[in-house]
Design a protein with these regions (language model features):
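PLD/PLD-like phosphodiesterase catalytic module centered on the HKD motif
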Residues: 1-170
Length: 170
């Protein structure tokens, strides 16, 4: 089974709400994680067994770079700040619910989530796996990639693949 998700005719959030089940095991590789994406999927994410998340670029790691190289680490800081919302989620940050969402998300993370970071200089393509279903490519875990807000991309093409394609991404 191969389906195309364009976030116009078929929205990733809606598809995930039907794909994620109680006891699901999820793996995500993406450049950033947003508490607002968690909020949109909270109902189903609270019921999963586990989520393994890997940042596709070095994020939340201790710097060991020379002083001359540090000036080029601004994108990493932006990825880390995206935890509390990207530039497209400003409207949500202004609703004064950020503290409550962050607390709920932190509690959920403590019980069900493992975070890791790609600490190499090698590129990783983002994807998401829910049990036996893979979504690829997946750039970020934000409301833009979920199809709730419009981002800077001219178009979105996420492919939903079932068995046997999904097992190679675990």
């Amino acid at each position: 089974m191969i389906e195309e998700i364009d976030n116009i005719n078929k929205i990733l959030k809606e598809d995930l709400l039907t794909t994620i089940q109680k006891g699901s095991k999820i793996s995500i590789a993406a450049s950033c994680f947003s508490i607002y994406a968690y909020q949109e999927l909270k109902k189903v994410l609270e019921e999963i067994d586990e989520l393994r998340f890997i940042f596709t670029s070095p994020t939340f790691i201790v710097e060991k770079a020379d002083k001359e190289k540090r000036e080029f680490y601004i994108p990493r800081l932006n990825r880390e700040r995206s935890l509390i919302g990207t530039e497209f989620e400003i409207k949500l940050r202004n609703e004064l619910t950020q503290k409550a969402i962050a607390k709920e998300c932190a509690d959920w993370i403590r019980h069900k989530v493992q975070f890791k970071s790609n600490c190499t200089n090698q590129n990783m393509v983002g994807f998401g796996v829910v049990d036996n279903t893979v979504y690829t490519p997946l750039n970020d875990f934000t409301i833009v990639d979920l199809g709730i807000e419009k981002g800077n991309n001219a178009y979105t093409k996420i492919y939903k693949l079932g068995l046997p394609f999904s097992t190679s991404n675990l």
